[in-house]
């Protein structure tokens, strides 16, 4: 699944570890999501969007 999570996270100055802790997953899970190797659940997508203060569209559907 292609997404903007890494771009948005880095722009916000947040590490994978910090984001993972905020949403209740491992750093490895965040890495897999960013690479497109893991399809997160809707609830995890929402948690990531809230943590990064972005919409689901901005993170997962409007890929730049």
Where are these regions (language model features)?
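Key DNA-contact positions within bacterial/archaeal DNA-binding proteins
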Residues: 17, 28, 57
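Recognition helix of helix-turn-helix/homeodomain-like DNA-binding domains
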Residues: 26-38
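DNA major-groove recognition helix of helix-turn-helix/homeodomain DNA-binding modules
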Residues: 43-58
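Short, charged recognition helix plus adjacent turn
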Residues: 13, 50, 60-64
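Short amphipathic helical patch at the helix-1/turn junction of helix-turn-helix
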Residues: 10, 38-39
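Short basic helix-loop element that most often maps to the first helix and adjoining turn
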Residues: 4-22
